[in-house]
């Protein structure tokens, strides 16, 4: 719809000359949220109007809003956006936005060849190689981090749970280990290393927990709803015993059941993780355009791989479902930070995880 309106704007410019943003007077690019605006005011309105606490004008709402002055007073700029008819209800939720992007990428992919080109195949192999070296084998190594005896499969379900401290210590150790392996995985990717160190850190802090759960899903059993890591068996009850809130764990279980039910192949898991990694909207990111292009490339390869490998019936909505699950992971990621702050003992044991979730 936006593209169509932008084309209409271009056509009207040829007939009537350039049209200006009704908020600041800059050149308008189309109708955004029900008003003819520039890209700057469109982005400002999306970022600002949904905040719980809005900006306050120190000059009683009398500031001029123009192209030159629009950044000086966010409160007056926001009020003018509302006065000219921009509507909050037209802003898509994170999930709806992810699904729209998924549909857009799917349409682009359908126009392009569904066969991966040589460069894309090589990129998939690089991702798989890094995943095989650092992430795939890490679950079998959990046993080296002093697990309580009742976590061993041959003890379950008979062995009663022991005191919580050994379990918390084990959880802290394996979470730190997983984050370390995910860092090694990303550092093994030339595209990731090509970014500035500041952006590498910002992307890792934003995506580490999401990549962790995408990878952990490979150990999840849909029938028992347990995670099997080498000789160890983890149940959601173990996390409850350690102090995690039941509602938080329910959202994690829901995610893993939905993802496991899609029966992904290893390349699809890895490409999903790469799509999460290269997210240009993480806090602190500076090279947004470059990272956005990287994410679009990963998403396009993921969609083409699905269309190439899966049956037509199975693949029809798979890509859109994966994009929706990535949106769910954002919510889990945010909730994980709060849980870590609440569990002070676990937080104290995992400084690396605390830094990632800060």
UniProtKB/Swiss-Prot annotation:
A zinc finger (NR C4-type) spans 21-41, 57-81. The lineage of its organism: Eukaryota, Metazoa, Chordata, Craniata, Vertebrata. It is found in: Nucleus; Cytoplasm; Cytoplasm, Cytoskeleton. This is Nuclear receptor subfamily 1 group I member 3. Keywords: Activator, Cytoplasm, Cytoskeleton, DNA-binding, Metal-binding, Nucleus, Phosphoprotein, Receptor, Transcription, Transcription regulation, Zinc, Zinc-finger. The record marks 171, 175, 216, 227, 244, 336 as: Important for TCPOBOP recognition. Gene3D superfamilies: Erythroid Transcription Factor GATA-1, subunit A, Retinoid X Receptor. The modification Phosphothreonine is found at residue 48. Heterodimer of NR1I3 and RXR. Interacts with PSMC4. Interacts with ECT2. Directly interacts with DNAJC7; this complex may also include HSP90. Interacts with CRY1. Interacts with CRY2 in a ligand-dependent manner. Residues 18-93 bind DNA. Predominantly expressed in liver. Residues 119-358 form the NR LBD domain. The gene is Nr1i3. Phosphorylated at Thr-48 by PKC, dephosphorylation of Thr-48 is required for nuclear translocation and activation. Composed by a short N-terminal domain followed by the DNA binding, hinge, and ligand binding/dimerization domains. Changing residue 244 to A: Diminished binding of coactivator NCOA2 in the presence of TCPOBOP. CDD domains: NR_DBD_VDR_like. Changing residue 171 to W: Diminished binding of coactivator NCOA2 in the presence of TCPOBOP. GO terms for molecular function: DNA binding; DNA-binding transcription activator activity, RNA polymerase II-specific; nuclear receptor activity; RNA polymerase II transcription regulatory region sequence-specific DNA binding; zinc ion binding. PANTHER family: NUCLEAR HORMONE RECEPTOR, NUCLEAR RECEPTOR SUBFAMILY 1 GROUP I MEMBER 3. Binds and transactivates the retinoic acid response elements that control expression of the retinoic acid receptor beta 2 and alcohol dehydrogenase 3 genes. Transactivates both the phenobarbital responsive element module of the human CYP2B6 gene and the CYP3A4 xenobiotic response element. GO terms for biological process: negative regulation of DNA-templated transcription; osteoblast differentiation; regulation of DNA-templated transcription. GO terms for cellular component: cytoplasm; cytoskeleton; cytosol; nucleoplasm; nucleus. Its main location: nucleus. SMART domains: HOLI (SM00430), ZnF_C4 (SM00399).
